[in-house]
From Swiss-Prot:
Keyword Transferase: yes
UniProt catalytic activity: S-ubiquitinyl-[E2 ubiquitin-conjugating enzyme]-L-cysteine + [acceptor protein]-L-lysine = [E2 ubiquitin-conjugating enzyme]-L-cysteine + N(6)-ubiquitinyl-[acceptor protein]-L-lysine
Presence of keyword Chloroplast: no
UniProt protein name: U-box domain-containing protein 21
Pathway: Protein modification; protein ubiquitination
Disulfide pairings: none
Record-linked InterPro entries: ARM-like, ARM-type_fold, PUB22/23/24-like, RING-Ubox_PUB, Ubox_domain, Znf_RING/FYVE/PHD
ARM repeats: 202-241, 245-285, 288-327, 329-369
Function: Functions as an E3 ubiquitin ligase.
Alphabetic keyword roster: Repeat, Transferase, Ubl conjugation pathway
Organism per entry: Arabidopsis thaliana (Mouse-ear cress)
EC code: 2.3.2.27
Length: 435
């Protein structure tokens, strides 16, 4: 049956409205004002006291504070501290009242979990660090499982864990045991935790970028388990963000290119596709010679097909990858061969995002500067001139506008050449042309 909830100013009356008329209506249930949260005017499930002495439901007051408010909603007094103390007395009274009413409309509120405190996180971190130094992987596994459970309980717990440097300790633990194939499950659990702990700092990423750690992440990237591959792709993206030659050499040695392209081709998830594209972009940007490896496994055609109907965040990353590929001669040749490229580049200008617009214009410029005037003619015929003019009129950054200006000059020159060519054909306008 369905119910409608009617709210009055100082108290809340719950009046069930039955979904079929033949049933007898139940009696009204009035929530006592002292059990209502002053913010939501709803029954408090986790009552807490703030510095002004007023009791609120924890979720409501946290939302209020996280929105930037620094005063008590009731008294309008500036809060001296944002600490929230559980009001056990009110909670027990509410629980007793729920049981006393014994109505299906009112369920007994469960005893809320005590929020995670920084001192607890510090102790967890200390124990994990100690077990890692001793090489006690069993103890590490127990602590890792505890961190996982805490993170699953609430977003607030995750925030507390992130703010107390657990990420670095987990990276150290991963590096310590990354060479042991028997501990693959535990190592993947660490990567799974790290996906919600970034940024973890340069020191932590450096631990993951060691030779043994990198080899382990690359191995997990080739797993048959999609969730494992997704975690590994996210971590690989972060490792490759390091501007270090050795890291990109590790990528070549461990067959990372093929694993990333396979992950994109398999369409495991939007997040894994984005992580893979960012990782590929970083690899090609830092080590252009690796582009040939990506070209051999069909990256251009896969990326172009993706751009056709991908969501904006994926589309802009795919365009950035193609732009990086066009830095090499072999890459430009492969891009020219694909008939879809130029129509897509023109279409995405001023449509997806500034990054996508800049990447599209950059690719057209690269193709023209290397002697491909046909590409520019195609761009002009497809309406690129008008779209690039639009780029100069909207609020894009200086770098984007500079590319737009350069591209306009180039297209203007090409349009004049095309116009002269058309004029020279006027003398043949009376010659009958076969269909």
């Amino acid at each position: 049956m369905g119910f409608l909830w009617r709210t009055r100013s100082n108290e809340k009356k719950i009046t069930p409205v039955l979904s079929w008329p033949e049933s007898e209506p139940e009696s009204e249930i009035t929530i006592p004002p002292e059990f209502q949260c002053p913010i939501s005017i709803d029954l408090m499930k986790d009552p807490v006291i703030i510095s002004t002495g007023i009791t609120y439901d924890r979720v409501s007051i946290e939302t209020w504070i996280n929105s930037g408010n620094k005063t008590c909603p009731v008294t309008n007094t500036v809060l001296t501290t944002f600490d929230q103390i559980p009001n056990h007395t009110i909670r027990k009274m509410i629980q007793g009242w729920c049981v006393e009413k014994g109505s299906p409309l009112i369920q007994r509120i469960p005893t809320p979990r005590v929020p995670l405190m920084p001192c607890e996180v510090y102790e967890i971190s200390r124990k994990l660090s100690s077990a890692t130094r001793r090489g006690d992987y069993e103890k590490c596994g127990v602590i890792i499982e505890k961190i996982k459970k805490l993170g699953d309980e609430s977003e607030k717990n995750r925030k507390c864990v992130n703010e107390n440097s657990v990420g670095w300790v987990l990276c150290d633990c991963f590096d310590k045991f990354s060479g042991d194939e028997k501990l693959t499950f535990m190592l993947n659990e660490i990567l799974s935790l790290l996906t919600w702990m970034f940024p973890i700092g340069l020191e932590g990423i450096s631990k993951l970028a060691s030779a043994t750690s990198f080899r382990c992440v690359a191995g997990l990237l080739k797993s048959t388990d999609d969730s494992v591959r997704q975690n590994a792709a996210f971590i690989m993206k972060e490792i490759l963000s390091l501007d270090e030659t050795r890291v990109h050499s590790f990528a070549v040695e461990n067959g990372v290119a093929e694993a990333l392209v396979k992950l994109i081709r398999d369409s495991v998830s939007s997040s894994s596709t984005k992580s893979s594209l960012i990782a590929i972009y970083q690899m090609v940007l830092q080590k252009p010679e690796i582009a040939s490896e990506f070209l051999e496994i069909g990256l251009v055609s896969i990326t172009v097909e993706m751009i056709v109907d991908a969501e904006n965040s994926v589309c802009e990353k795919a365009l950035a990858v193609l732009d990086a590929i066009c830095e090499t001669e072999h890459g430009r040749e492969e891009v020219r061969k694909n008939a879809l490229v130029m129509p897509l580049l023109v279409k995405k200008i001023a449509k997806v995002s500034e990054l996508a617009t800049r990447s599209s214009m950059s690719m057209i410029l690269k193709l023209w500067k290397t002697g491909n005037t046909v590409a520019v003619e195609d761009a002009v015929r497809l309406g690129a001139f008008q779209k690039v003019l639009l780029v100069l009129q909207v609020g894009y950054g200086e770098e984007t506008k500079e590319k737009a200006t350069e591209l306009l000059k180039m297209m203007n020159t090409q349009m004049k050449l095309m116009s002269d060519c058309v004029d020279s054909l006027k003398e043949f306008k009376y010659i009958k042309k076969p269909f």
